[in-house]
Amino acid sequence: MTCYRLAKRRDLFAFPYPIAIWRDPPKSVEIVRNLVADGGFKHIYTVGDVVTRNFLEYGLIPTSAAVDEKTRRGIRVERFSAFRSVVEVVNPPGYITDEAWSAVEKAVEGGVVVKVRGEEDMLSLAFIRLAPPRSIVAYGHYMGALIAIPVDWYRRDLLKLFDFLEKC
């Protein structure tokens, strides 16, 4: 069973790790597109409704995505047809439930939208841990940046964040 709960040091999880792109779309998506091309990345996983919608809208189709259909801007992802399947899970704020972890395990294989009832934010860590080599995990930072994580470059360091999670 794989379940984690954020119990302490929330400040560490709000930090804009490691590549913060402080540009609005479509420029932010173009920067990631260039990073993918220049770095030889094969997989892109998006976490969050706004980021996923922007990637889809500007033609950078994620390998898989996680959304919760709740944004400050009222934006919804409606192009689920870009993916083979939709997996619905329950994942409360501050958690990575066993059900959500299993869905991310399927999602890293490609073509999956993980549709979360609750909150999808913490699933970025599951994607970072489970993504295959040559992957990027992208999500939105609460202050407006697009965060892009080349997993091969930063996985070891970012997995230290699991030390601040409690098993549940």
Curated annotation (Swiss-Prot):
Q: Where are the transmembrane segments?
A: none
**What keywords sit in the KW lines?**
Coenzyme A biosynthesis, GTP-binding, Kinase, Nucleotide-binding, Transferase
Q: Provide a Gene Ontology MF annotation, just one.
A: kinase activity
Q: In which pathway does it act?
A: Cofactor biosynthesis; coenzyme A biosynthesis
Q: Name one GO biological process term.
A: coenzyme A biosynthetic process
EC number(s) per UniProt?
Answer: 2.7.1.237
Under the heading InterPro entries, the entry gives: GTP-dep_dephospho-CoA_kin
Briefly, what is this protein's role? Catalyzes the GTP-dependent phosphorylation of the 3'-hydroxyl group of dephosphocoenzyme A to form coenzyme A (CoA).
Q: Which HAMAP family match?
A: Dephospho_CoA_kinase_GTP_dep
PANTHER family this protein is in?
Answer: GTP-DEPENDENT DEPHOSPHO-COA KINASE (PTHR40732:SF1), UPF0218 PROTEIN TK1697 (PTHR40732)
Query: What is the name of this protein?
Result: GTP-dependent dephospho-CoA kinase
